[in-house]
């Protein structure tokens, strides 16, 4: 609990005073191949910080500005996942037509600690998550988004079923 409190206070300091709070809900363990599923509801909170960790690529192309995030995911079958990682975002209009639009593309990658609770057994406490998200920015700068993510232990153990998540989120700037 002390570690969680330290991390929470650290990431809420003025150094990290811009970005988005992301509140999401979705479908956990979505299967597209008809195989057995241990579906649950996925609840997610992330804090996406607006400060760039380091820049790679051309200066005029913000697609390469890597930014940190931290969050927690909980499922209706009591699994929990504490995660930290990097994300980037790019305006889809600017990416394809050169003109800004309200559509934002946000891929992310993170690593975290997973406790399966009564949920799906993913084979290891350490798990990796990759997510692709498209959001629509409203006039007040809030965003609504849909995302697809995959959690896996990257073959750190012999058991590695992985899990797919489809979720919807509401994002509020801070």
Where are these regions (language model features)?
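Solvent-exposed loop/turn segments connecting transmembrane beta-strands
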Residues: 30-40, 72-83, 97, 119-125, ...
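Cleavable N-terminal export/targeting peptides
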Residues: 1-19
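Residue-level signature of outer-membrane beta-barrel architecture
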Residues: 47-51, 88-94, 136, 150, ...
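Helix-adjacent hinge/juxtasegments
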Residues: 77-107
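Repeated loop/turn-to-beta-strand initiation elements of outer-membrane beta-barrel proteins
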Residues: 21, 51-56, 94-96, 103, ...
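Outer-membrane beta-barrel "beta-signal"
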Residues: 41-45, 161-174
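Transmembrane beta-strand segments that form the barrel wall of outer-membrane beta-barrel proteins
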Residues: 21-31, 63-75, 107-113, 146-152
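Membrane-embedded beta-strands of outer-membrane beta-barrel proteins
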Residues: 43-47, 84-86, 132, 168
